Amino acid sequence: MDVLSDIKHRIYPRPFERLSNLRGRKNLVGAEIGVAGGEHAHSLLKTLDIQKMYLIDPYEMYAEYEEGKLHYGVDQLALSTTEIFARERLTEYSDQILWIRQLSSSALPSISERLDFVYIDGNHQEKFVTEDIDNYWPLLSNGGVIGGHDYYNGFQREHDGVVKAVTSFVVKNGLQLRVELPDWWIEN
């Protein structure tokens, strides 16, 4: 990715929080799967009226994660450092956030209420994106939004799993998919 593309890729707020039906709603409860350095969580907390936000990220290497990330130089030390940066970045919102340091599939019992939104930016392999959508869609409140990052079709092969999983879910359930790169979302 060239420098200009990388800068555009990291611009906040992202389309998800700018264009979905979340703007103007009060006391939102949501979740972000795949927090990384906390940049997007910070943008969500700054942009939207969020009462509570579950931040879900294991910050640990696991077999399927390693397959996709080792070529980026990601190792356990990098993940631990990223977690420290995320926690520092989000300190001002500590009364609004609940950290869940687990895989998203293991985090489900920790969520005790309906969610107004779920933002998925975890493992980009098709099976994991499918699992996240299937697991978290039923937790959405009426009018809730599920969406995520990296909906790139064709020109970034490492994100093909996102496109396949999202498209399959939308077609299978007769839903309307909204896309503004790099984000996608579906309103319940």
Predicted feature residues:
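Conserved SAM-binding loop and adjacent beta-strand
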Residues: 1-14
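S-adenosylmethionine/decaboxylated-SAM
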Residues: 2, 17-188
